[in-house]
Amino acid sequence: TTPYWVLLTLAFMCGIGGGAFSGYMPSTGYFFPKRLSGTALGLQGGIGNLGMSVIQLVGPILMGFGLFGMTWLAPQTQVKGDHVGESIWVYNAAEFFIPWCLVAAILAFIWLRDVPVKANIKQQLDIFSNPNTWYMTILYVMTFGLFSGFSAVFGLLINNQFGRESSLALPVLGATFAFLGPLIGSIIRMSWGIFCDRMGGAIWTFISGVGMAITLAGIAWVLYNPTGWTDFYIFM
């Protein structure tokens, strides 16, 4: 019964976190020597991305029982699936992380250092006339954009293409595997910074772009007409 505009508002507010993430990434290079900037950025970005995997892993678990101190909130009732009529505490997935978010915000306020801004608003707007701005934007959409987008729809894609309500009707649940995509991506991002420091970021961006193109072509081929468990394993 929740209005759609409420969900959009909540999504927008959560997006502030994504904006803050993108905003502080460029400043990392100011606090580390250039020879270690790839490692620093990889660790910072990878650990940040790891939060997506954590919520997708523990979220379904937290929804299965009433949290201590929060049982005064009425649970929802499942209306379809194998557990019709059973209680589910959907709000637990958000409430559990509220204290951690507050702690992180306080620590950031105390310990993070600001990068001095020397350019005025007009000077900052000059980036839009620089072709490199648009080249980097395209690269960012290709890499992090695809990572975050596919991580968000990974579970839904499994349900729609292979799950019990799909034409294949396999006994698989997207929520069981949803955390794997962002987990693998985050680990690779954390560990690959050191290789970028040694070989350069351009070559690895090129390699990742080629690898993503090949992988996407393979996924499209599998999802075009999946026939059973074999296609599911290939997709995974």
Q: What residue ranges belong to the model's regions?
A:
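C-terminal membrane-cytosol helix-exit motif in multi-pass small-molecule transporters
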Residues: G64, I98-V117
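Glycine-rich segments within core transmembrane alpha-helices of 12-TM secondary carriers
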Residues: G18, G38-G64
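Intracellular juxtamembrane helix-capping segments at the cytosolic ends
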Residues: G19-P33
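Extracytoplasmic gate region of multi-pass secondary transporters
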Residues: P131-S186
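Helix-to-loop junctions at the C-terminal end of transmembrane segments
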Residues: I188-G201
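C-terminal transmembrane helical hairpin of 12-TM major facilitator-type secondary transporters
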Residues: G200-M236
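Juxtamembrane intracellular "pre-TM" segments in multi-pass secondary transporters
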Residues: R113-T137
